[in-house]
């Protein structure tokens, strides 16, 4: 008879030094009993408390625009700060091409609150609200889920004092300022007809304001401002509503009135319910370390989940160029051309969402490329000499055209264009493969065959273009030239990005076509060409401008950016590591591991740029110390805002650094990018963790780590697909039991890889096959709300 599950659940707070100590997803030493969160066949986590550990605490008012707090419902976003009592900027992601703001709201009568000596505030990420209190007043701001309306609920106001709120735009904007007695609106439309690649479509912005109070009156105070005045209710409460829907023109007052009337019927609970349901879905983390650095990173990862949900649920991505555009507090200013998307700055967000178990937050990313497929096909045919398939522009307008329009260049730059002069992304031809591989990863994680069928044309057309662009040498080799090694090396032979793209994409297309039972001819051609792809280029650090012989693995040899290593470098990228991530060709073992490690250690740009993938690539390679040091270094360098968001170039809030951080934490805890589940492949021993990470086939790994030891290891099966697990305790006998019945489903084995054939909806414990010591006490993973700002070196989350 098998031992009970509880018999195996043990925890060690020190290193295990004897094989007689056991674990079943949990390690045990009878002398140092601990706790496990596993009971009755599942992992128990008190989600509300864990999420609220990451609330952002303000002990002083956030008076400056750069101190603004982010809010949003995935379509309408806000930046909220305390300038002149209360200021909020509304932002949408569909006011193309310049992503113009619908306006700012100012409530000067809230100065009594923000000027109070007892002022305090909390960005409540569990509720999706910004809560302020002071001087006997409270103000709670949020964006409704059902409608694109921001709501400010105030209590403690003096009913005798006239309240006011203004909705304002600025020069050179030219809105129509409209009032109808109890509400005011600013409406503006424009044509997308000036930039290169213009769509000719009409876009616009509409914002409308009203209040739930007494003696309400609206007036136009200037061509750019409407104002409402009112008294609070007798109990001192009032509510201000500001609606901002998608706007392409029409009867602005009628549309505004309809929206605001509907919004007046919404309750706070409706909005909170959505957020509470949202927080039931992601895999959460509770991290701790003696220096509290782990807690700080946990906070940033939770903020990443929060901002992703707040900005990523519209028809197209809310973020471009790595910026949190929906959280802007600087009017209509943009560092980067706001009509375009940079794929390089989206990819970490896609990956982080997958590992968090939130694939639905990638819907707008895939829609950007799927819906623009006809335009990308046309672009490729026009600018790539009539070739078939798609060359996806690395920098692509929202309408699928490969123009980068910047105020600081005299002529729009072309992407994926054989007819362009050499430039950063003029001939970056690997982006289509990257998008395709994220389609494939999303399918592997979700098993959604309908999704795969809808997006498969991206894979097919990307592969067809690469076949058409590449040429064969007399020996049969398949090569690309002229081609960019992303933005760093222009018009070179066989960039590492191209080689990696084809090595990764071709097998994915073959498998996808087989699943969907289509394109057998293409699959056969790709299978044939796989044998003709070049190996990765190599150089020796002693002579970095000269290629070494193929497959040279001598000391000092690293992966080069292309087969033209002496080519001029134009950007600070580590392209020799692209085969590690995102392409997943090299991991923490295998014949290329050693050279990849050397490439990482000798990378030219260490912890450079807020989008740096250093910590993710370190985790993929199993470099624990490098994962930790790079994650901390990038955070201390770029996370400068009290909201937890980053600064990079310009004055906008960047979300990409938190995306890298979230992805890196997940990757260091659990990896499953190639069908092999790796447990804690790069997790620091001085960081404790209680975490859930998504894996392929709708699965989840629940993991508790203490001082480097695995305390609990449970797997939730989301499908009947087989799961391959690398032995978490190399060389030791491991078994897997059904978590509810305790019936062994995998007999004890000391093999390097353990296979599990799960039952949908069942959970399993992975454990050592020998158990000793006392059963561990059950204790759910719990947390308490943050009550102070957090700090990491010179950086802070919150305001002291």
Residues covered by each model-derived region:
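Acidic/polar, glycine-enriched structural segments that form the non-catalytic walls/loops
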Residues: 32-66, 71-339, 359-363, 369-381, ...
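Catalytic cores of secreted or luminal carbohydrate-active enzymes
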Residues: 99-110, 652-701, 706
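Short, well-ordered beta-strand segments enriched in hydrophobic/aromatic residues
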Residues: 150-156, 502, 701-703, 710-717
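Surface-exposed beta-strand/loop patches in extracellular or lumenal glycoproteins
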Residues: 161-172, 714-730
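Acidic/His metal-coordination segments adjacent to aromatic residues that form catalytic metal sites
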Residues: 324-336, 396-425, 480-495, 563, ...
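Active-site core of glycosidic bond-cleaving carbohydrate-active enzymes
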Residues: 342-378, 385-393, 398, 414-417, ...
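Acidic/histidine-rich catalytic neighborhood
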Residues: 461, 465-515
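Solvent-exposed beta-hairpin/edge-strand motifs
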Residues: 725-741
């Amino acid at each position: 008879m098998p031992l009970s599950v509880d018999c195996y659940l043990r925890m060690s707070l020190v290193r295990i030094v004897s094989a007689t100590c056991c674990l079943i997803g949990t390690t045990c030493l009878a002398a140092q009993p601990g706790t496990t969160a596993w009971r009755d066949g599942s992992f128990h986590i008190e989600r509300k408390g864990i999420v609220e550990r990451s609330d952002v605490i303000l002990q002083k008012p956030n008076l400056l625009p750069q101190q603004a707090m982010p809010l949003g419902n995935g379509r309408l976003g806000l930046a909220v700060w305390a300038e002149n009592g209360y200021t909020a900027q509304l932002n949408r992601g569909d006011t193309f091409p310049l992503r113009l703001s619908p306006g700012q709201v100012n409530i000067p009568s809230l100065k009594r609150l923000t000027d109070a000596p007892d002022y305090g505030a909390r960005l409540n990420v569990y509720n999706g609200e910004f809560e302020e209190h002071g001087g006997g007043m409270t103000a709670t701001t949020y964006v409704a889920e059902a409608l694109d309306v921001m709501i400010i609920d105030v209590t403690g106001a003096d009913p005798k004092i006239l309240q006011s709120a203004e909705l304002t735009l600025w020069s050179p904007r030219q809105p129509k300022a409209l009032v109808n007695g109890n509400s005011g609106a600013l409406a503006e439309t424009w044509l997308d007809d000036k930039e290169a690649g213009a769509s000719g479509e009409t876009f616009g912005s509409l914002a409308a304001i009203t209040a739930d109070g007494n003696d309400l009156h609206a007036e136009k105070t200037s061509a750019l401002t409407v104002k409402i005045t009112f008294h609070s209710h007798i109990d001192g409460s009032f509510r201000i509503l500001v609606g901002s829907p998608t706007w392409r023109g029409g009867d602005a007052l009628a549309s505004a009135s309809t929206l605001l009337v509907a919004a007046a019927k919404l309750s706070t609970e409706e909005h909170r319910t959505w957020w509470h349901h949202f927080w039931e879905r992601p895999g959460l983390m509770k991290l701790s370390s003696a220096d509290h650095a782990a807690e700080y990173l946990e906070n940033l990862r939770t903020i990443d989940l929060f901002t992703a949900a707040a900005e990523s649920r519209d028809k197209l991505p809310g973020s471009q160029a790595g910026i949190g555009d929906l959280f802007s507090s600087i009017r209509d200013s943009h560092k980067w051309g706001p009509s375009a998307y940079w794929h390089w700055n989206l990819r970490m967000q896609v990956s982080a969402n997958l590992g968090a178990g939130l694939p639905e937050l990638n819907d707008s990313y895939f829609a950007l490329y799927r819906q623009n497929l006809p335009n990308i096909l046309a672009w490729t045919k026009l600018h790539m000499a009539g070739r078939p398939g798609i060359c996806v522009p690395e920098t692509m307008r929202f309408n699928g055209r490969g123009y980068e329009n910047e105020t600081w260049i005299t002529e729009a730059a072309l992407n994926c264009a054989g007819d362009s002069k050499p430039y950063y992304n003029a001939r970056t031809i690997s982006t289509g493969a990257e998008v395709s591989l994220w389609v494939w990863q999303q399918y592997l994680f979700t098993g959604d065959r309908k999704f795969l069928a809808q997006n498969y044309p991206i894979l097919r057309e990307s592969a067809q273009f690469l076949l058409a662009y590449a040429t064969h040498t007399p020996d049969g080799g398949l090569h690309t030239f002229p081609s960019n090694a992303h933005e760093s090396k222009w018009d070179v032979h066989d960039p590492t990005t191209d080689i990696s793209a084809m090595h990764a994409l071709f097998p994915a297309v073959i498998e996808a076509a087989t699943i969907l039972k289509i394109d057998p001819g293409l699959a056969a051609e790709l299978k044939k060409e796989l044998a003709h792809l070049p190996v990765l280029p190599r150089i020796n650090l002693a002579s970095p401008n000269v290629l070494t012989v193929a497959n040279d693995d001598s000391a000092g040899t690293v992966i080069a950016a292309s087969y033209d290593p002496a080519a001029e470098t134009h950007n600070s990228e580590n392209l020799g590591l692209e085969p590690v991530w995102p392409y997943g060709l090299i991991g923490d073992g295998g014949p290329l591991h050693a050279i990849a490690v050397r490439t990482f250690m000798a990378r030219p740009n260490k912890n450079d740029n807020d989008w740096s993938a250093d910590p993710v690539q370190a985790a993929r390679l199993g470099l624990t110390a490098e994962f930790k040091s790079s994650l901390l270094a990038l955070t201390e360098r770029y996370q400068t805002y009290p909201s937890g968001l980053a600064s990079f170039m310009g004055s906008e809030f960047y979300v990409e650094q938190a995306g890298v951080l979230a992805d890196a934490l997940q990757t260091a805890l659990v990896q499953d990018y190639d069908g092999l589940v790796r447990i804690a492949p790069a997790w620091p021993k001085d960081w404790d963790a209680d975490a859930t990470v998504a894996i392929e086939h709708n699965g989840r790994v629940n993991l508790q780590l203490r001082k480097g030891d695995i305390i609990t290891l449970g797997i939730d099966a989301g499908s009947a697909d087989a799961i391959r697990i690398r032995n978490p305790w190399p060389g030791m006998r491991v078994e897997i039991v059904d978590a509810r019945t305790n019936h062994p489903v995998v007999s004890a084995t000391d093999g390097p890889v353990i296979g599990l054939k799960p039952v949908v909806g069942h959970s399993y414990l992975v454990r050592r096959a020998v158990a000793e010591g006392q059963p561990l006490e059950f204790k759910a993973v719990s947390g308490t709300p943050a009550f102070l700002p957090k700090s990491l070196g010179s950086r802070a989350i919150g305001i002291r």
